[in-house]
Amino acid sequence: MELGLEKLARKLGHRFGDFSLLTEALTHRSVSVGHNNERLEFLGDSILNCIISDELYQRFPQASEGQLTRLRATLVKGETLAEMAMELDICDYLRLGVGELKSGGSRRPSILADALEAIVAAIYIDGGMDTCRSLVVAWFTKRLDTISLDKIKKDPKTQLQEYLQAHKLDLPEYTIVSVNGEAHQQFFSVNCVIEALEITTLGEGISRRKAEQEAAEKAIQELPKKP
């Protein structure tokens, strides 16, 4: 067991039988291409979605599939997971390469969110689904207790699409303008073009989806200005 991980384990609320799982979950690709947290992150993403989906299904019996999807998206989006990782002090235990450390990687939302998902998988493998579910629900309790159907809204791309359909206009076209950065840490720039309204907006983000959402949100802000 590496020094300090026992303290993190207590913070997480789980006594690991195999601390190498926790070490792997904290290891960024910049440290080791072949032995890092990417596989655990892949598994943890699915487990987290399953647990939160089930919890929302039980808590909101009258919610539609679309409403449940938006509730889940709010809870498991990268920004939320990064906030939780900070609350759990995961940032203090990340294993990063020299370059990532110098560039502030321990506070980068995408790295924090990925590490939290990897830790979820590590706990699942080490302690089983029941243990993992109990801990995840405990971590999310405050957010689960405060989220409501009144507080959720459709994402910008959906809002824009519905507006255009209601006005019998062609849907927007999203085009990648540029992609910068390493393969595991890319930054996207995307144009959203609505030809009928002569609107063109630029969105940026750490994924194509995030860039498209930002571009759509900017386009929505321009809609009232157009006849």
Predicted regions and their residues:
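Double-stranded RNA-binding/processing signature
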Residues: 1-227
